[in-house]
């Protein structure tokens, strides 16, 4: 088959002269249906309105560019937005350490606790020998307030927690981050407060602006009819072993009796351990306390060192020599030598018997051995007499 020859008469519109012809071939409904002439184009770009608009636009653009350049060279200082205050340090240090010494005052203020055992099911128990309260997390801990005479009206009771050891006393006792974010507990109390009061709508949770310490204050109520003391129910909202919180550091709870002006009327304190099994921990610590024989735990932390046992010595105690219970057979040639070794063995047996047995047994045994020894001595004399005589054939 013959290939069709290309039509050379068709030329591509490669010049500006053919562009107007192609423009006329476009359909009439096209947006660009009419091609403007060269005169109209010149009038468009050379009209006074367009020229003024371009000049105004150019001036505006130049002004914007100049403003941008000046801004880049000399930045304008904007008024900063109010910055939020920095959060408080996780462990704020207090400027003063409250005292925890017992002070009964003029009203004979003292504390009391309910008698409870050491069973596994108990949720709160107090050890008088340790002056320590063992309780579970967020469980009711009744504390009794005893006074000899009624304080003045408006008296308040304050509860505050501090660390027991000297190196941590300046730190504020607060809950761990995990329990702070939890929604459990009283909504009236701040989430960072460790001690809370149960069943008292007049409780006030205070943060000291100078020491940053947390405390809860309730008005003092006289004992009810038929009762000798006032009871306040406290809750501890974090475990002693929580990381980021107490972190196994022992704490003390200070209960103070104050007048309306804040003057101290009485003070008392006790150690607290918040754990999962209060009864078990109380038994363990009381046994350790009895074994160590430490002084009273109410003494200052400086004297809380472990006392060395008095019976310690560098050299071990001498060991008693134990008699060997084995028996051996010794072959001896000659009857005379046998008698001599027999007497020596009996003498050693007598010495051992005197060292091990009492005087009564030793007396009977020695008399028996002496009689036997006397018989052996007489036999030895007879043998010597026979040897002194003439030899027989």
From Swiss-Prot:
Membrane-crossing residue ranges in chain numbering: none
Keyword set includes Transferase: no
Region (Basic (repression of DNA-binding)): 368-387
Residue numbers of Omega-N-methylarginine PTMs: 333
Residues annotated with N6-methyllysine modification: 370, 372, 382
Annotated DNA-binding residue span(s): 102-292
GO BP terms, alphabetized: cellular senescence; circadian behavior; DNA damage response; entrainment of circadian clock by photoperiod; negative regulation of cell growth; negative regulation of DNA-templated transcription; nucleotide-excision repair; oligodendrocyte apoptotic process
Protein name per UniProt: Cellular tumor antigen p53
Source organism (scientific name): Cricetulus griseus (Chinese hamster)
Phylogenetic placement of the source organism: Eukaryota, Metazoa, Chordata, Craniata, Vertebrata
Gene: TP53
